[in-house]
Amino acid sequence: MAETYSVSLEKLIEQMELENVTGDVDVSRIEIVQTDVNRPALQLAGFFDYFDSGRIQIIGHVEHTYMEQKGLDYTLEMMEIIMAGSERHTKPPCIVFCRDLYIDEKLIQLASKYQVPLLRTKKETNAFMAEVIRWLNVELAPRCSVHGVLLDLFGEGVLIMGESGIGKSE
């Protein structure tokens, strides 16, 4: 069975230069295991079938405008469902607001209650998504370790493999 890899949210925040709006949430213990991200537009509209909450949730201009139009009470209700988790879905590792969008204080309090980090970036949504997906694909890529020596024999590369300590380099 293939080994699965993870990356800490703390490392992602540092690498992507994200602002942690919920400073009281311990991001060092949160691990990201999926390379995909999700824009929760359908979830904000109340549709939670097939919701992959294990992904980083990204709020862009479209989602933010929708939340503003629906009002704060409705937004808090939907975001609580997203953040609280249930028997059908887990809590997301984090929610990222792009384009330096405004985050209401009540939403920050809700995120703190459920220990879901709210992060913010100045980057445009599509640019941020492309960057984070590329970075996660590298960090979470499958790996293979072998004991071996590479040689150049008459211009051809040769890999000699074997157990450690059997004299491959002799």
Residue ranges of model-derived segments:
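Gly/Thr-rich phosphate-binding loop signature of adenosyl cofactor/nucleotide-binding cores
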Residues: A2-R88
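Glycine/proline-rich, flexible active-site/cofactor-binding loop segments
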Residues: L136, R143, I160-M161
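Pre-Walker A adenine-sensing motif
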Residues: E139-L151
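Glycine-rich phosphate-binding P-loop
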Residues: G155-E170
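Charged, amphipathic alpha-helical linker segments immediately N-terminal to NTP-binding catalytic cores
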Residues: K91-V96, D100-N137
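Structural motif
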Residues: R55-I58, P93-V96, V116-P117, G157-L159
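Residue-level recognition of alpha-helix initiation/capping sites
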Residues: D100-Y102, P142, I166
